[in-house]
Amino acid sequence: MNAPDRSRNPFRVLQTHRNFRLFWIGQTLSLMGSWMQTMALGWLSLQLSNSAFIVGLVASVGAIPVVLFSMHAGALVDRSDRLKVVRITQAVFLIQAAVLWLLTWQGHATIGLLLVLAFIQGIASAVEIPARQSMIILLVGREDLQPAIALNSSGFNLARIVGPAIAGLVIHRFGIAWCFGLNALSFVAVLWGLFLIRLPKVPSPFAGTRAWEVITTSTRDALAGLRHLDQPGVVRDLLSLVSVGAIFGAPFITLMPVMARDRLHLDAGGYGVLLASLGVGGLIGALMIAGPASHWTRGKVLRTTGLLFPALVIALAATTNAHVAEELLFAIGVVMIMFNALSNGVLQLRTPEEFRGRLMAFYSMVFVGLSQAVGAFAIGAVANAVGVEWAVGASALITLAFASWTFARSPELARV
């Protein structure tokens, strides 16, 4: 009786695990700054180019290194101290945001410079994301992994609410540059939390391996990881579903500046409200997974949210009413985060420790890399040719068709 009562408290993991509490607080504050930068960068790209294609291009360039290097980075993460890796890459993010602030503040920002800085950020992200994601189980243990992932998602979505709201005010009062400056400052919070974390030493099967051996064997290890993930079963089916959703479903977020301005006739403040609506929904979805929804059948929730997400994005593409768009984005946020948090947890729990870094590397390669490098680039090009509503609607329809087919042919997904 006690265990269910405890699990219904979505914040129990924060109370129980000091290391995760430090990580979560610092990460959430930093993500607020990151969402400010995301909103400001999309708006700045649109101002400098007046092109949906360029907005998609800026988003996609930062994802190219994630596609190219993620699996090698995952092999490196599996051989490394993950906490140290996260500390170093977060420091790189701080420097990148500071340079972006300085260039924009002095009026020297150009599309070319934005592309270069986005590429540098992508290189760091290729290493940081699998290290950070696979570190969560070390902070809380296997028993609390699912609620910890859900709470991590809740912090992400809390930041998506607060960050764009602050960004809208900052852009209006002080200009776009200060969004980048505040983001640079926010990385101080996450670095502070990371340096306070103390993790026990975990014996590595790669202990004693020299640095040059890590480099020369990373390709072999990356291929071994791919072979493991390609084995028939729930992991492969779920990764396929996640991949198609990330490439065709998620990139609608990249074109939100264009939809806000051209379809819904909103300014930067209105664009911030749209992103905040998505964040509020995501926060609710994450808390549902961390709390009461943890008692639902995971397979049924995966199926319901996996089908609802693209259907709601199709409805969003069709609307020209800002209030309806806000309501749809709220609903999209709920189902998108519920699906993502559940799929992330299922994948990690079904993958051995020695492959977990490479699993999360593949996950980040798809969610951050292919989603932006392929999905955002393609949807931006299509939007430039036929209109943003057709681009978003068609990509979501592809996602819906694939999800329907996958759930129909993989009944074991309903039993995870």
Report each predicted region and the residues it spans.
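Flexible cytoplasmic inter-helical loops of multi-pass small-molecule transporters
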Residues: 1-8, 195-227
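Helix-loop boundary and gating motifs at the non-cytosolic
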Residues: 6-65, 227, 231-278, 373
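Short hydrophobic/alpha-helical segments at membrane-entry points of transmembrane helices
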Residues: 23, 109-117, 237-238, 323-329
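Hydrophobic alpha-helical segments of secondary membrane carriers
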Residues: 26, 151-159, 241, 362-367
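Core transmembrane helices of Major Facilitator Superfamily
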Residues: 34, 120-132, 332-343
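C-terminal transmembrane bundle of multi-pass solute transporters/carriers
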Residues: 58, 67-72, 79, 85, ...
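Hydrophobic alpha-helical transmembrane segments
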Residues: 111-118, 122, 147-206, 270, ...
